[in-house]
Curated annotation (Swiss-Prot):
Name this polypeptide is given: Heat-inducible transcription repressor HrcA
Family statement: Belongs to the HrcA family.
Pfam families per record: HrcA, HrcA_DNA-bdg
GO process terms (BP): negative regulation of DNA-templated transcription
Lineage: Bacteria, Pseudomonadati, Pseudomonadota, Betaproteobacteria, Nitrosomonadales
Function as written in the Swiss-Prot or TrEMBL entry: Negative regulator of class I heat shock genes (grpE-dnaK-dnaJ and groELS operons). Prevents heat-shock induction of these operons.
Organism: Nitrosomonas europaea (strain ATCC 19718 / CIP 103999 / KCTC 2705 / NBRC 14298)
Keywords: Repressor, Stress response, Transcription, Transcription regulation
GO MF entries: DNA binding
Disulfide bond positions: none
Length: 338
């Protein structure tokens, strides 16, 4: 645990590094920390922080810069979030109209990019994810093509063709439908998918092959209710010095933007949070994101989480400004969709 002096100096170092983009030396820390300490004493504290993994010292400079661990401690413990000014709030309120959901998602990602000067991301609601089902049925079309029939409480019928890697018999499919109808009728497809993932984790060892097949068929079906990722402002990353100097990192990021599946997996994690969630560098376990941070927040429709909004930028971002932008955008989007 850091003592108060270490916290103040780490906070000052992160803030100066975010502001200046250069390793921070002891004289700068003495000037901006408000502590009456000599440069020698500050250097000793920096050595301690470096040994604990909160800061690092590049070979070309006598100053220090925050590590991922340093950023994480700063964000979780030391950060003071700023309120959005009235002009920014008014802009969001005026632009986020619920008239056209697809247009609304495009506008949201664009506004996030414009307000932060980084990349704005919106994961749109699943086409079928919010539907409550009364009855599900699977019909074999060919060996690995299955027709999913979903009936809502209102009597609406939705059909979807599923391509599976495993061949299932019609009796397997009937058993799968019976299992889902018995255990999950009245749930949304999103709730079913979460439940099936738990079933796969908890019951796989003692489940019969047939029940295993039933759950996997259901999981295949629900995974097919695809989401879309709306991205705006990718070009802004070329203006970020921390990233533009590293072409291989930029290339990896743009590959992720193009494929979107990796980004979707990351954004999916924020559904489990009740507010803003922040991934810093390698915390996401995704090598493409080692040089960036992702700030996300879930949004709702009729009280259920249906998607996420987020901003992708350098680790050296003004978190105190980005966090409220993402947070308020998610809340306004929820309000307009409901």
């Amino acid at each position: 645990m850091l003592n108060e002096r270490e916290k103040i100096l780490l906070k000052t170092l992160v803030e100066r590094y975010i502001h200046e983009g250069q390793p921070v030396g002891s004289r700068s820390l003495a000037k901006f920390s408000g502590l009456d300490l000599s440069p020698a004493t500050i250097r000793n504290v920096m050595t301690d922080l470096e040994e604990m993994g909160y800061v690092s010292s590049p070979h070309t400079s006598a100053g220090r810069m925050p590590t991922t661990l340093g950023y994480r401690f700063f964000v979780d413990t030391l950060l003071v979030v700023k309120s959005l000014d009235n002009e920014q709030i008014t802009l969001l309120e005026n632009q986020l109209h619920p008239n056209n959901p697809t247009h609304l998602m495009n506008v949201t990602s664009r506004l996030l990019s414009e307000l932060t000067r980084f990349v704005g991301v919106v994961v749109t609601p699943k086409r079928m994810g919010g539907a409550v089902f009364r009855h599900i049925e699977f019909v074999a079309l060919t060996e690995k093509r299955i027709l999913l029939i979903l009936v809502t409480p209102e009597g609406d019928v939705q059909n979807r063709i599923i391509l599976t890697e495993t061949a299932y018999s019609q009796s397997d499919l009937i058993e799968a439908g019976n299992f889902l109808n018995q255990h999950y009728a009245g749930c949304t497809l999103e709730e079913i998918r979460s439940g099936l993932q738990r079933e796969l984790t908890q019951l796989r060892r003692d489940m019969t092959g047939l029940m295993n097949a039933a759950i996997e068929i259901g999981n295949d079906a629900l995974q097919e209710s695809s989401e879309a990722v709306v991205i705006a402002g990718e070009h802004r990353l070329f203006d970020v010095r921390d990233l533009s100097d590293n072409l291989s990192s930029l290339k990896s990021l743009f590959e992720m933007f193009e494929r979107k599946s990796k980004l979707l997996q990351l954004m999916e994690l924020s559904r489990q949070a009740h507010g803003v969630k922040i991934f810093i560098g390698g915390e996401s376990d995704e090598t493409m994101l080692e040089e960036v941070s992702v700030v996300t927040a879930p949004y709702e429709m009729e009280g259920k989480i249906v998607g996420t909004v987020g901003v992708i930028g350098p680790r050296r971002m003004a978190y105190e400004r980005i966090i409220p932008i993402v947070d308020i955008t998610a809340k306004l989007l929820s309000s307009n969709l409901s």
